[in-house]
Amino acid sequence: MSRLAAGLALGALLSTTAMAQQEPTFHVDVPLVNVFVSVTDKAGAPIGGLTKDDFQLFENDKAQTIAVFERDTSAPLAIVLALDLSGSVYKDFAAEQQAAQHFAKDVLRPQDRADVVAFADGTREVTGFTGEAKRIASGLSGLHPGTGGTAFYSSISLSSGLLRPEHGRRVLVMISDGDNTVNGVSYEDALDEAVRDEVMIYSIIDVPVAASAGRDLAGEHAMITLAEQTGGRAYYADQASLDQVFHRIADDLRTQYLLGYYPRKRAPEEQGGFRSIAVKMSNAQNNAKYSVRNRPGYYASAAR
């Protein structure tokens, strides 16, 4: 074979190989899914110092690769403080105001924002989102309890809507006995809105009396399940323990972990809809010692 023929043959081979290697690849942009995770011991104290290797993350029971990891995450906080002004919580209201003011002063960093919502027969936004703890304190000071009913679920709907455009961690801190006496928004609707808007609910359950008689146990149960189903937490409180409860919420928010992942490729029939999220400890011993909390999932079209 002549040098020219050999050269042409080699060139054709290289060209064919290059074409095979350069076959078009189609990429689909998959949004990063952020999951904020709280880890506590059996006494409820936050656990810090864990690493990415300490966690396993699953979407719809399928293991995912953790692409982003932060401990004591600096992700901004957007917090709504929702206070019940109805007659059922009248006796503890002054202590609730003061404890909420201390909380805002304690927890807000330069990158954080807070808002105040008040509810009784109706619901209303009080301050608008602000990074100034003094403005939050002023808004809280201007609230006065009444004698009307409680639009509890409507307040969750309003708060979720206010938090929807905010970036970072969306947190709703509710102070109430959970006694919903105003028709309009149902429990299911309120929970669905909070999950869709990725709102973590921290429920502070006002205990009017120690005995079960005279208490709205169904309302208390609703406040507990709303917290559990959104990755938050529920606390019982009276006048003496309000400051301590707010302090525990602040500690919980300060020590959260951020786990981010790009969901693995899904079959066409799996596109869209609700995607469950589970976070576990990699070590079986840690799984037995610690409790892990995170939002239960997200709607695929709204991943953030």
Regions found by a protein language model. Give the residues of each.
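Bacterial N-terminal signal peptides
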Residues: 5-17
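N-terminal secretory signal peptides that target proteins for export/translocation
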Residues: 1-2
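Scaffold/interface architecture of coatomer-like assemblies
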Residues: 19-304
